[in-house]
Every structure is written in C-alpha cells, then in structure tokens.
Amino acid sequence: MSVKYIFVTGGVVSGLGKGITAASLGRLLKARGVHVTIQKFDPYINVDPGTMSPYQHGEVFVTEDGAETDLDLGHYERFIDENLSKNSNITTGKIYWSVISKERKGDYLGGTVQVIPHITNEIKDRIYRVGKSERTDVVITEIGGTVGDIESLPFLESIRQVSNEVGRENVMYIHVTLVPYLGISGELKTKPTQHSVKELRSIGIQPDVIVCRTEKYLSQDMKEKLSLFCNVPEGAVVQNLDAEVLYEVPLMLEKEGLAKIVCKRLGLECKEPDLDEWEEMVRRQKNPKSSVTIGLVGKYVELHDAYLSVAESLRHGGIGNDVEVDIRWVNSEEIENGEVNSFLQGVDGILVPGGFGDRGIEGKINAITFARENKIPFFGICLGMQMAVVEFARNVAGLHDANSSEFGETPYPVIDLMPEQREVDEMGGTMRLGVYPCKINENTLIKGIFEDELIYERHRHRYEFNNEFRDTFIKNGMTLSGLSPSGKLVETIELKDHPWFVGVQFHPEFKSRPNKPHPLFKDFVRAAYEYKTK
C-alpha cells in the first residue's frame, strides 16, 4: 500500500490547536492498527527553536536523536506514544540552509535558484523522507502558522504539489479553523471560516475536512452552511469543542467520526478502534480520588507553555496515582529576598525545572532550602538539580560561596562547564543533546523507582557536576545515585536524610506519556500525596 499523506492547516487565527488535532487523529488511527508518524513545518527562519526565548516560543522539546524542536512534537509523542526524530520538525531556516548549501556546492549546475522549484522541492523531500525513513502507513504533517501568512506560502504550494505527484487518492487536507461565538448576539459566525477556506482554495488546495474549533455546539444548519460554502461533504464538517481535559480531544473527535472519514477517504484498511486504555486514562484523570499541590518554581512561569512537558508529566503522575495535581506557579525572582514561606506554604511537593541564565537563581536556591529543611518532596530537573547541588554546597557542606561557573567567578564551582563544551563557539545545536544511558547504583531511592540498572534518558545541557567536589558531597550526606556508564558524569543525586529529594541532570518530562507516566513523576506525585496525608 502506498504511503498516505495528511496535511493539517490552520485558518482565521493562530493557537487553535492544530497540533492537538493532528496528534488526536494520530491516536485514533493508531487505535485502528495504522502505523502513523507526525511532523511539523514551522515557517520561521530560525534553524530550530533551540536559541529562541521561551517567552516567544514556549518550551524546546528534545527528541531521542537530539533535535531541539517545537513543543507540538511533545503533544505528538504523548498522544501517539511513539518516539519522533529530527525529521519531524522542519523550519524555513533548515530548508533555506539546505538549499543554499547545495547551491554553494554547485548542485544546481549554475541554474537560478528560486522558491519554485528549489525551495518547494526541498520541502517535498522532507515530507517524503519521513514516509521512507519510518515504518509508516500515514504521514501527518502540520503546517505551522495561518493560511494567508506570507511565510507559509512555500509550504502550502509544496503540499499542493504533493497531491499531483503521489495521486490525489493518497493525499488528504484537513483545515482547522475558528467558528467564533458572539455573546452580544448569541450567535456562532461562519464567515471567518468561509474566507479562510476561500484563501486556501485560491492557492489550489481544496480541504477534505474542516475541523471547527468552537465553544458552542454547531447546529445541523450551521454544518450544512459550511458544507455548502466551503465545498466539503456535510459529514466532513467536524466540530471540536473546548475539552475539560486535554486527552479527551481524541475521544471527542472519535464521536464526530473524524477517523472514519479519513480511513474511507484514503482507502485505509482500518480495524475497529481499541480505545479502552485511553478511555480509562481519561476517566481516571476526570475522577481523581484526591489532590496534591506542587509548587513549580521557575523564571518563565508567566507563560505556562515554557514548562509544558513538565506540567503534563506532573498530570501524568497524578493519573497514575488517581490524584489531581494542582500546580502553583511560583516566579523564582519573587522569592529571591527570602519571602519563600508565603509563596510555598501548603504545597505538597516542590519542583525546580530546567533553564538557563542567572535570573531568578537565588529564588530557586531558596525554594530548595525550604524543601530540604521542611522535608517536603523535592524534584530538581537539569538546572534544578544543579541548583540543588549549589544549595547543598552552601548550606550543608560549608562551601558558602559555591555556585555554578555559568553564573560567574566562584571559589567553589561545584557545577562547571563540560570539558567538551569549552571549545564550542556557536550556541545552536551544540549542547549535550538527546538520549544517553545512566547507570543507577544499588540501594538508592532512584533504583527502587526504576528497578532497572541502566536507563536511557534525554539530555539538554552544557554544565555538569564538578567531580573535584564528589568526596565533599558524599561525606556530607549526598548520594550520587546515578552516573554515566563511564562513571565520569553525575546523572542523579538524592539525600539520605530526606524522604524524597531527587535531582536529575536529564529531562524525564520528554519521555512521559499520559497512559505511561514516567516513573520519576509518578513516584514524586506519590511522595507528595504521602506527605500531604501523613
């Protein structure tokens, strides 16, 4: 059977949830025995989001093979429960970089390099490459941005050409659009969707399905109107209401018949969907037996998407324990002067996630001190682990001016730049990225959580525990519970005299799934609930 291609575009406004729609469709097709992979094209000129501000872009999601990608890839992996690769996130910057490099090598034989055909051919090559490199029946491709944006035009032209090259029977276009509700008149308005589809058709793409994001139910008359003006079958107008919980969206789209429409349109051999596990997971999330409050201490907390995978992983841990996780977002800058108690009083656990730069660092250290002294479950990730090391050095080991060398001169650089990073000049894509093994020591909390001796986790860092201080930390009560197989890199730390105090250099949030919570997040939430009920 030929590989099938589904393209998901967006109209009217950005932020409608194209990524969630694509991921949900992937889950529904996988439930029918279809092998699915997903990719996203982003129209910005950055090569990847690795050097972009979290305030502009949200979190950077890291794949197994070390690609720094859009946060939507996190949604894709969590929904379809598959590991994606660097081929799954392509930017305008990557496309132009590749084309210009080929031109410099003389690959175009002296021809004039143009958007059509050279840029569009490069885009199509990235689409086909995923279909060839992955064992897949269907490639779902999300086109970032909004129809009508000048930046998206080469991508839209490329996906138009794909249908000519592989056959219209092997291609499907899904357009996600907004049907706004005007409270003053009590009406849903279809005109924005009509104009968005008109714009899409003007460049040669006729959508096969329109997914309507709306806060109110679409009436049958409304669906008939959209069908008429947008030239799609009436049954292909799918409503996508606001969901109570994120992972309910696939079930809502299943009721709307989206996957059946896709299977019929593309001629896919689909079995009856097996969504029992997913339905049970959603039921558990919507009906918790209790709740815990986790204080998430970071410097980008105004934009929750900056910590999207961490927040979702906490919720996964909650599902695994049948408790609801309420996240208390704490700006680390606001607790730099010692006002910790008023911000963290009453929390059942404290999590300090990853990050870069010295802004808000002292607030994170204050939060860690609060967790350590009050025996509150603590979880430090990447920079969070590093700051736990600094806090311990200052307040337990007697190294009062200890710090990370990332933040300036210090007599005790307990966190230091990795040796292989010392000669690196460029910022983008040069960190220790992707999956690396970690060997867990016996008789440790981490060993009890994982059971396995060797685990594989994703990383994104330049700095590490300074081995010159190992003996000092061990002597003062810190356990270095996980190391790289060579024994050179400290991967995990914990405290002997604390019920649950764990720091990890890696990013476990990138491997957590709603139906398969990461063991660390699941046990952290368990410990938080135990702390609450003791």
UniProtKB/Swiss-Prot annotation:
Mg(2+) binds at D72, E142. Keywords: ATP-binding, Glutamine amidotransferase, Ligase, Magnesium, Metal-binding, Nucleotide-binding, Pyrimidine biosynthesis. Pathway: Pyrimidine metabolism; CTP biosynthesis via de novo pathway; CTP from UDP: step 2/2. The active site is at C382 (nucleophile), H507, E509. L-glutamine binds at Y55, G355, L383, G384, M385, Q386, E406, R462. CTP binds at S14, D149, I150, E151, K189, T190, K191, P192, T193, Q194, K225. Allosterically activated by GTP, when glutamine is the substrate; GTP has no effect on the reaction when ammonia is the substrate. The allosteric effector GTP functions by stabilizing the protein conformation that binds the tetrahedral intermediate(s) formed during glutamine hydrolysis. Inhibited by the product CTP, via allosteric rather than competitive inhibition. This is CTP synthase. It comes from Ruminiclostridium cellulolyticum (strain ATCC 35319 / DSM 5812 / JCM 6584 / H10) (Clostridium cellulolyticum).
